[in-house]
A protein has these predicted regions:
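Peripheral, non-catalytic segments of secretory and membrane proteins
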Residues: 1-305
């Protein structure tokens, strides 16, 4: 018997919220990556790690917000806590690998393709590990074509996100790139969801065990949401993260070209020109002594010298 699968139990609330979570994580991750490229090598690894955590948590939060709208009419659904945590770790780690590769090696074709492939496969793995963490009275079956399509979407979205992380500058371009990332990652999630069917059985080969959505998913979403909030506060209080490279460069140029003048500095004294007669009889200090000869002798009150 095939179960009645509904991926939109709460209407458009869950897909819109999922998109916002993915876009938020992408936006914060992009800003942190921009900051790492202009803050020197001392804190570069820290900024890249913070950006990877933001993007990974955003993707994972998007996935499980979408899962809240998933239901099967004929059976209850529960979630395996360890597998759910594994899916979160996979999301953060694979995004971190991609971000660090492009952060240190740039976006050359080979580097970008390799990092995008690793990250995309990791995001797809996160999705299907999260799906497997569900327990219900039945078995899952997947449409192979849609599964392959969802993986391709994940790889393309990850490659585009990594390229944008080290290329896009400015607040509005980053906002647009984050929106595209949110659409792509959310589209990957719902493509993977549409690939799944549930075959119910009376023997309960996948008996519902673990925690329900309210007892497992909602508390587990708290941690990633707090992390996104912390990263958002950091971004708000660092104008270089918000404004991007242009403002950063402008600030450096202004600082390099600005030299404060001393207050109340007295003007340098200017020597008055000496009278011609005095110049004739009393040469300037440092001037060569006149040669000894008739032209160098002159009369004064003491006689001719």
């Amino acid at each position: 018997m095939q179960g009645t699968v509904d991926g939109f139990s709460y209407g458009l609330i869950t897909p819109i919220t999922a998109f916002l979570m993915a876009g938020l994580g992408g936006a914060l991750g992009l800003r942190c990556t921009v900051r790492s490229l202009h803050g020197g090598r001392t804190f570069k690894a820290g900024w890249l790690a913070l950006g990877a955590a933001a993007i990974g948590c955003g993707v994972w939060t998007m996935h499980f917000v979408g899962m809240m709208g998933f239901s099967v009419a004929e059976t209850a659904i529960s979630y395996d806590v360890p597998l759910t945590l594994v899916s979160l770790a996979v999301a953060v780690v694979v995004v971190g690998i991609g971000v660090f590769v492009v952060g240190y090696r740039g976006t050359g074709p080979v580097t970008l393709a390799t990092a995008g492939l690793i990250t995309g496969l990791g995001v797809a793995a996160m999705h299907y590990i999260g799906m497997y963490s569900m327990s219900l009275r039945g078995e899952f079956a997947y449409d192979a074509l849609l599964v392959v399509l969802s993986v391709l979407i994940a790889v393309v979205a990850s490659t585009a996100a990594l390229w944008a992380a080290v290329t896009v500058r400015g607040f509005l371009p980053s906002l647009g790139a984050s929106a595209v990332m949110g659409v792509a990652v959310t589209g990957m999630h719902y493509t993977g969801m549409s690939a799944m069917t549930v075959h119910l059985d009376g023997h309960g080969s996948r008996l519902a065990q673990g925690g329900s959505m309210t007892t497992v998913l909602l508390p587990m979403l708290f941690g990633p949401l707090v992390l996104l909030l912390v990263v958002g506060v950091i971004v708000m209080f660092d104008p270089l993260l918000v404004s991007g490279e242009d403002t950063w460069n402008g600030t450096r140029e202004r600082r390099a070209g600005h030299r404060p003048r001393a207050r109340h500095a007295a003007p340098a004294p200017v020597a008055a020109p000496r009278p011609a007669a005095e110049e004739e009889f009393w040469p300037r200090p440092g001037a060569p002594a006149p040669a000894d000869g008739p032209a160098s002798r002159y009369p004064d009150s003491y006689g001719t010298r």
